[in-house]
Amino acid sequence: MILAARSICLAVVLIGAQPAIASDNPSWLNKQMTFKQARRAILRAGWQPIRSDDRDHDYGVVSALHHKGVKEITQCSEGESFCNFYYRKQNECLRLITIGEQLPALKVYDWTSECPDE
């Protein structure tokens, strides 16, 4: 009985230690936004860009955005150019996914509460 009670207490402590996740449907973010609009809304809502590793920014859309000061970009696929941007607010993470090949044309495709691999 004592062992079971300790296990439950340990489970509660471990669950409580998990980082919180971003709201799946923030009212200030929608799929009709351009990346610039979404980024502005994200920063206004108190999120901070998670700076990515500079060594991975030597080509295409990633390089162009990184040189424009968008340091939170982590990667873009080739072809339709889906790009990932990461933000943090306290213990929460927000991953913004865009589609497009140039900054003015980048549109919000989706978002998740994923944190980048660290």
Language model: regions and residue ranges:
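Low-complexity, intrinsically disordered Gly/Pro/Thr-rich segments
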Residues: 90-100
